[in-house]
């Protein structure tokens, strides 16, 4: 009787983790007690799997570490229990049949029970296979050991599955949090784009309203004047018809001719079906462009300009700005960039070309370009150029020339990729073009292709991917819209940033990465 009670007490003070009597027991808020070492190991396991909350290994109720308390009462019970030993009589009762009082010496295979010889002869066990305990103990010890090892293996698998699901849970949470952040950022960008598009569209409508109403007001004034003139003429005729014969005939031919030659002037009208139709912006495309710009901006480098000996180009002290200066003695230049197709000569020092070469562009000046001081020989590089308020410029990259104080760029300019120039340009305020290789008939004259640029850029971004052999130009003013991209560039030499303010005195400025 007493032994049964002691067994029950022992079960109550046994650690559910190590299955031994509690050592330095600690109580959780849920009521379960564990060894101090076991609960410490449980904490480390929770940290290993990045669990946000710790939970009881028995009931899985979460708890905070500061709520754990030492259980002095249970510790005292364990100490007393370790001192208690079963008396010989009580130990003897454990080995005797509770029903017959005989020694428990046999094992019933069918019922898997330890029995006495009287139990073997009872109706309950008649016909069953029974063995002496000594005969089967070793066999079942091996089976139990095998089962224990199998169970421990399954426990490891179960713990791994538990850890895997916790890891997957944490991974999903991280992924969803990341997606939520991206969604919020994307919609914020879309809102900015929509606000910009709305403001731009409203400005266009206000401009249209101003132009149309101004024209209609002018027409209205003209119609009022025309009506007033008609009234005065009608009044004159009525007065003549009602007056004397002399008044009737005085200057009658002149007034009749005025009436006969009179033509009603019709007001200028605007057809509503000819108005510009508003179209909602392609938000996905704009967002994709914005993402591409965000990606290339990660490679922003701080570019400064190299010194030069060109009298036409003035570089500021901070080496970020270049502007055109009209010298007293102008260079005898061939003229503007996109003139009519007539013969001209310009200087070029590109290998393989002559010092004076004839082409079919007119009035184009090559002698105001400057290079960046940093060479590009590998990797990805990005920079931005402020071209606001300029009516003409050329920018991009130039290959093969080391810039220094003695470098004369005007002797080395021929804007074709085969000669190491990957550039785009602007002239006359709104005409954008890209410079391509000239034809076989005009190998030293670049082939100039017009570009469609809806919104004129105040800033142009230039991105060079040396390994991919590409040069890209972005319209920063229009959400990073791709203006043009050179592919399969032959970067056999180092390349340098290139800026040409042309004959426009407004400066070009290299923007700092922090701008």
Curated annotation (Swiss-Prot):
GO MF, one annotated term: pattern recognition receptor activity
CDD domains associated with the record: Bbox2_TRIM5-like (cd19761), RING-HC_TRIM5-like_C-IV (cd16591), SPRY_PRY_TRIM5 (cd15822)
Reaction(s) the record says it catalyses: S-ubiquitinyl-[E2 ubiquitin-conjugating enzyme]-L-cysteine + [acceptor protein]-L-lysine = [E2 ubiquitin-conjugating enzyme]-L-cysteine + N(6)-ubiquitinyl-[acceptor protein]-L-lysine
Domain of life, per lineage: Eukaryota
Keyword Protease: no
Phosphoserine, modified sites: 87
Cellular component terms (Gene Ontology): nucleus; P-body
N-acetylalanine PTM positions: 2
Post-translational modifications reported in the UniProt record: Degraded in a proteasome-independent fashion in the absence of viral infection but in a proteasome-dependent fashion following exposure to restriction sensitive virus. Autoubiquitinated in a RING finger- and UBE2D2-dependent manner. Monoubiquitinated by TRIM21. Deubiquitinated by Yersinia YopJ. Ubiquitination may not lead to proteasomal degradation.
Function: Capsid-specific restriction factor that prevents infection from non-host-adapted retroviruses. Blocks viral replication early in the life cycle, after viral entry but before reverse transcription. In addition to acting as a capsid-specific restriction factor, also acts as a pattern recognition receptor that activates innate immune signaling in response to the retroviral capsid lattice.
Name of the protein this chain belongs to: Tripartite motif-containing protein 5
Origin organism lineage: Eukaryota, Metazoa, Chordata, Craniata, Vertebrata
Gene: TRIM5
């Amino acid at each position: 009787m007493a032994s049964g009670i002691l067994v029950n007490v022992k079960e109550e003070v046994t650690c559910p983790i190590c299955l031994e009597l509690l050592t330095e027991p600690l109580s959780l808020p849920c009521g379960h007690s564990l060894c101090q070492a076991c609960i410490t190991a449980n904490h480390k396991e929770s940290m290993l799997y990045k669990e946000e909350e710790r939970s009881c290994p028995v009931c899985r109720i979460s708890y905070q570490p500061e709520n754990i308390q030492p259980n002095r009462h249970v510790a005292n019970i364990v100490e007393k229990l370790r001192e208690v030993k079963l008396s010989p009589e009580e130990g003897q009762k454990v080995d005797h049949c509770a029903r017959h009082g005989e020694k428990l010496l046999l094992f019933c295979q069918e019922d898997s029970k330890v029995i006495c010889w009287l139990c073997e002869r009872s109706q309950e066990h008649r016909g069953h296979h029974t063995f002496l305990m000594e005969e089967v103990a070793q066999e079942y010890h091996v089976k139990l050991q095998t089962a224990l090892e199998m169970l421990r293996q399954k426990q490891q698998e179960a713990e791994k599955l538990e850890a895997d699901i916790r890891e997957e849970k944490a991974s999903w949470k991280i992924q969803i949090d990341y997606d939520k952040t991206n969604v919020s950022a994307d919609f914020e960008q879309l809102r900015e784009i929509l606000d910009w598009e709305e403001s731009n569209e409203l400005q266009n409508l206000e401009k249209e309203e101003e132009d149309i109403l101004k024209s209609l007001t002018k027409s209205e004034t003209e119609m009022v004047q025309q009506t007033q003139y008609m009234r005065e003429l009608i009044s004159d005729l009525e007065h003549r018809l009602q007056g004397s014969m002399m008044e009737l005939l005085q200057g009658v031919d002149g007034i009749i001719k005025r009436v006969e030659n009179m033509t009603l002037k019709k007001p200028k009208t605007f057809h509503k079906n000819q108005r510009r139709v508003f179209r909602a912006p392609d938000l996905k495309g704009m967002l994709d462009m914005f993402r591409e710009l965000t990606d290339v901006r990660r490679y922003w480098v701080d570019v400064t300009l190299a010194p030069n000996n060109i009298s036409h180009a003035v570089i500021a002290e901070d080496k970020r700005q270049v502007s055109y200066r009209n010298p007293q003695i102008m260079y005898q230049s061939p003229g503007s960039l996109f003139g009519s197709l007539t013969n001209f000569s310009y200087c070029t020092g590109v290998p393989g070309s002559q010092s004076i070469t004839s082409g079919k562009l007119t009035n184009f000046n090559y002698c105001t370009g400057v290079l960046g001081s940093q060479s590009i020989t590998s990797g990805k590089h990005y920079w931005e150029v402020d071209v606001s308020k300029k009516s003409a410029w050329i920018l991009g990259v130039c290959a093969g020339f080391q810039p220094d104080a003695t470098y004369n760029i005007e002797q080395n300019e021929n804007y074709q990729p085969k000669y190491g120039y990957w550039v785009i340009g602007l002239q006359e305020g709104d005409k954008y073009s890209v410079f391509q290789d000239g034809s076989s008939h005009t190998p030293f004259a670049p082939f100039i292709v017009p570009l469609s640029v809806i919104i004129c850029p105040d800033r142009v971004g230039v991105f060079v991917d040396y390994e991919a052999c590409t040069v890209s130009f972005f319209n920063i003013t229009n959400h990073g819209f791709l203006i043009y991209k050179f592919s399969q560039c032959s970067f056999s030499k180092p390349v340098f940033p290139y800026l040409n303010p042309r004959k426009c005195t407004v400066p070009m400025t290299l923007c700092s990465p922090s701008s």
